Amino acid sequence: MPQSLPFSPAWLAFEEAVRGASHRGDHLRIIEGGGLSVDLTAQAYSPQLEAAGLALCEQQGFALARRQLFEGGEANWTEHRPAWHTALRAALPPPSVAKDILNERERLRRFVDEADARGAYKYVLHLGIGGSDWGPRLVARALRHQGLKREVRFASNVDSHAVADAMHQLDPHETLVIVASKSFTTTEPLANAEVAIHWLQNAGVADPIKQVVAITANVDAALDFGISPQHVFRFWDWVGGRYSLWSAIGLPIALAMGNNTFDELLAGAAAMDEHFLRAPLAANAPVQMALAGLANRSVMGFNSLAIAPYDSRLAHLVPWAQQLEMESLGKVATRDGSPAGVPTGPVVWGMTGTDCQHTFFQWLHQDTTGAPVDFIVCEHADHTYDHHHRLLIANCLAQRAALLRGKSFEDALAETCARVDDPSEARILAEHLVHPGRRPSTLIVLPRMTAHNLGALLALYEHKVFTQGVLWGINPFDQWGVEFGKALARGIIGELDKPSGMASADPSTRYWVDLLSRRS
């Protein structure tokens, strides 16, 4: 049974080891897993810290929790169900769910093959939100250099400007609309589906609903919506929204790039699953990333994690990771209801390189706190501008080295004295050139941007987050804060439609509901 962290023996030893560890990056630590290289050299390290991290995993019951994750145990204990997304990408799914998974995979494959054979649909309009949007959106952007069979557009926000932009210049007669919602009650995809169906109707499409596909765990609701059974693809309650890319939610990927590309994505994630399951914990990339994250957040007090993919194709990785990490770890209650007792999930933010260098890296280098950074880069590019790719890699490595190395006052003073005659002015200027250094970072290297490597990268982050949830003692598979906000929104929309005073609301909410209901 996991222990409350703050005063547990393994946590106290881990905390002491972090404070006593080297932060100079003088011990080369590179882990190979799932086809990726994960370089943790610039994270805190000592043999004592490595041992303390393994002891913490043992104390918190990590081995049992990992086994339950892969065997369909109650990993999501507050909702009393598994979190079995790993089964979706296994070549041979667990026997109890294999028939359902393989049948749905085959239905998906057949739908895509038949559409290809008929030359059906030039465009796909994917309507989801959160996990049903960010995963396929990320993959579609990251792999489009491989060529597209169909153009895919995404709309998620309930702001109808977004869906109007997505539909702009599409041919309604050649567009397949995908409505992706686990519950098939979520406001955003259903509201956008109504807009899309009206768009099809207004264009003279004879039977608009025939061009609509549903992906959901609530098949009955999709059928009630009017979608034909042949166009309803299923996933299950034990698949969390932010882990649903590996299910039928991946349909737009298969339609855009082919079934084989989606298969390779699953295979890459499965390869990282195997690494996570089999590799010793000291050489286990997700586990060691998780322990580094605990050291940074819960001991050294870093409030955030920056993600800097030095590849423009990974532009959507940051919001995908924001949802994965912050929706999974943005909580404090442990299994018995007591608080974790230490800082938990960090704020996740970032941008692709080299744009990020001209946006927020100044803060990373010289702010009083800074933040750990995950650098991500591909060894090989998929263009012919070799010099440009070398520039990209050089910038990535240089920024990481600068964050680690820093610049002392003495070095800065030697630099300023060489170009400023006045010693007093040289000393003042030198203060501005000091970089604290010893800022932690991780470097993740993909050999090339392929579906396999991308699948492995996403699974790496999934398993890191799972491990941190186990070590902090929190459930990474629920999202009660999201549900609370949704419930309040339902009450407010009722008031905007038919005001009654909202006596229980705060004064500001009452003011704006009253004002906007009268003006609308």
Swiss-Prot record:
Pfam families: PGI. It is an enzyme of class 5 (isomerase). It catalyses: alpha-D-glucose 6-phosphate = beta-D-fructose 6-phosphate. Pathway: Carbohydrate biosynthesis; gluconeogenesis; Carbohydrate degradation; glycolysis; D-glyceraldehyde 3-phosphate and glycerone phosphate from D-glucose: step 2/4. InterPro entries: G6P_Isomerase, G6P_Isomerase_C, Phosphoglucose_isomerase_CS, SIS_dom_sf, SIS_PGI_1, SIS_PGI_2. Its main location: cytoplasm. Catalyzes the reversible isomerization of glucose-6-phosphate to fructose-6-phosphate. NCBIfam families: PRK00179.1 (NF001211). One of its GO terms (cellular component) is cytosol. Belongs to the GPI family. One of its GO terms (molecular function) is glucose-6-phosphate isomerase activity. The lineage of its organism: Bacteria, Pseudomonadati, Pseudomonadota, Betaproteobacteria, Burkholderiales. This is Glucose-6-phosphate isomerase. It is found in: Cytoplasm. Its EC number is 5.3.1.9. Keywords: Cytoplasm, Gluconeogenesis, Glycolysis, Isomerase. SUPFAM superfamilies: SIS domain (SSF53697). One of its GO terms (biological process) is glucose 6-phosphate metabolic process. Disulfide bonds: none annotated. It comes from the Bacteria. The active site is at E327, H358, K486.
